[in-house]
Curated annotation (Swiss-Prot):
Name of the protein described by the UniProt record: Membrane protein 0
Entry's localization field: Host Golgi apparatus membrane
Chief location: host cell
Domain notes: Late-budding domains (L domains) are short sequence motifs essential for viral particle budding. They recruit proteins of the host ESCRT machinery (Endosomal Sorting Complex Required for Transport) or ESCRT-associated proteins. Contains one L domain: a PPXY motif which is involved in the interaction with ITCH, a member of the NEDD4 family.
Subunit structure: Interacts with host ITCH; this interaction probably mediates ITCH degradation.
Domain of life assignment: Viruses
High-level lineage: Viruses, Duplodnaviria, Heunggongvirae, Peploviricota, Herviviricetes
Start and end residues of each stretch annotated as Disordered: 1-25
Motif (PPXY motif): 44-47
Length: 129
């Protein structure tokens, strides 16, 4: 029978589990696995929100209106650029979506008219003999 030493948290005494005779007869320690709450507490944030930005020491401080402004680091600059692109796409969508709907309506109406006209055969010109 195999004996497995299992410890849930560091510093707590291990629990000894005895397996069935069919398992290998080797003592195997199980690595420590944190609980969900411990894993969430230790996990780094997936991204930094604009409200929680912590500015790094300024590399090239500049002065605007008599106050020293700190420069953005690379992640802040990338976040700002992505945010500006998102705002630009939102502005374009507000203008272009109605225009495309109107264009789609006009093209659909034109296709319907062409289909109706194509159904009726052309009449031969009146020939007087």
């Amino acid at each position: 029978m195999a004996t497995v030493h299992y410890s849930r948290r560091p510093g707590t005494p291990p629990v000894t589990l005895t397996s069935s005779p069919s398992m290998d007869d080797v003592a195997t320690p199980i690595p420590y696995l944190p609980t969900y709450a411990e894993a969430v507490a230790d996990a780094p944030p997936p991204y930094r929100s604009r409200e929680s930005l912590v500015f790094s020491p300024p590399l090239f401080p500049h002065v605007e209106n008599g106050t020293t402004q700190q420069s953005y680091d690379c992640l802040d600059c990338a976040y700002d650029g992505i945010h500006r692109l998102q705002l630009a796409f939102l502005r374009i969508r507000k203008c272009c979506v109605p225009a495309f709907l109107i264009l789609f309506g006009i093209l659909t109406l034109t296709a319907v008219v062409v289909a109706i006209v194509a159904v009726f055969p052309e009449e031969p010109p009146n020939s007087t003999t």
